[in-house]
Amino acid sequence: MLKLTLPIAMEQFFRILVSSVDTMMLSSYSNDAVAAVGLVSQYSFFLVVLFSVIGTGCSIVLAQYLGAEKSETELNHIAQAGTIMVFAMSVFMTLLVIFGTNWLLNRYTLDPLVRKYAWQYFVIYGGICCFFQAFSLLQGAILRSYGYTSEAMIVSIIANLTNVLGNALSLYGWFGLPVLGVPGVAAASGLSMLVSCILFRVYIKRRKDVVFHLHGITKVPRDAFRMVLKVGVPTAGESLSYNVSQITIMAMISTLGTYAISAQVYTMTILRFVFVAAISIGQATQIKAGYFVGAKQNDIVYKKVFSYQLVATTCSMVMMVVVNLIKRPVIGIFTDIPEVFSFVSTLLIYSAYIEFGRSLNLIYVGALKGAGDVRFPVLYGIFSNWTFMVLGSYILGIKFGLGLVGFWLGIGTDETTRGIVMLLRWKSRRWQKHALVK
């Protein structure tokens, strides 16, 4: 488990570190730029999750196929089916982003400069560079399903360093280059995805046991698409619901002003370091659950998942204590605006509630999906997103006047109730009848 988890954790940590550096670099350029990029990052993340749906479907099916020792032909058909679906989806989303961004931004109450920056970033990164992002995510998911998490970590580090260098050139005008601002930052992010896409392909070619050939891609059997979609479509529903609910919450937060948006962005940037362990263990749990279920070793994986969750929760809670002890200098890295500083400081205290629930949620949902039990966590997740997170945040944050604290309480209630329900689902062992390999 450690062999899988550690590279994933390092990859996640480095990715979050670079994202934080991006935020700091943008904050030195303009607070309006931070608010703009933070706003459309909800949509950018939506694209990531949408493409990850196919990657997740391929990863879960491949993990169970590998555990069941399926043939190379069957393994390759799954990867090819994912490629076809990702290509079609990326073309559609590119057109949607380019022609629909103005309509999306009109749904928000934004200062003119914030709106301009948001449009520039999303059209370039979310639209023009969409194709590279899609295939990078798919290839990464396939490589990890074979257990090559170290290679995925190396690709992530190189791609993120490319992103940082591109940002520096765009914002600071090194070597006499013009300061490109937000468009340059978006282009740098797109370039990093291109680098990632190329490197993943190189690693897949080098690993002879990773079966992913494009030859004969037009002859993929329908069953391969069905297997991927059986897992991917329900996951898409959950992902769509979660991200639309996040966008809805951001729209409500935007009515509180630019300072509130900036505080939300900075707080989430800090929290990503907190849940890096939980999300890494959750991803590794999904892979391991797939292997064990495919090999029909249900009793072993049933017990192991509880220990995985205990480690994840402990890591998250220790990190929350550490972050709150050193939060003043940490927040000072991002902002010196008193109002924003105060917002972030308060939110970090309430974030312990969110992270406790998130640590449960990430592990048990990962285990259930790896076992093939996708529909239940999806349906309950949709219910919880809109009942506890959106409605709860609206009532507490807007109606009761608690502001950002009310939103944080709503989000925490969603994460915690979902985590407890998923724990009970795992204990019931109903997931055993949902294995993809019979």
For the regions a protein language model found, what residue spans apply to each?
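Helix-terminus/linker motif at the lipid-water interface of multi-pass membrane proteins
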Residues: 13, 17-35, 105-112, 169-180, ...
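Short alpha-helical transmembrane segments in multi-pass integral membrane proteins
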Residues: 1-8, 62-129, 177-233, 289-354, ...
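Transmembrane alpha-helix boundary/anchor motif
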Residues: 21, 57, 95, 99-103, ...
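N-terminal transmembrane alpha-helices
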Residues: 1-24, 28-29, 45-57, 87-94, ...
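Transmembrane helical elements of multi-pass membrane transporters/channels
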Residues: 3-22, 159, 192-196, 200, ...
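Small-residue-rich hydrophobic transmembrane alpha-helices
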Residues: 23, 34-95, 133-152, 250, ...
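Short runs within selected transmembrane alpha-helices of multi-pass transporters and secretion channels
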Residues: 55, 125-144, 152-163, 185-200, ...
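Transmembrane alpha-helix boundary and packing residues in multipass membrane permease domains
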Residues: 8, 12, 23-24, 60, ...
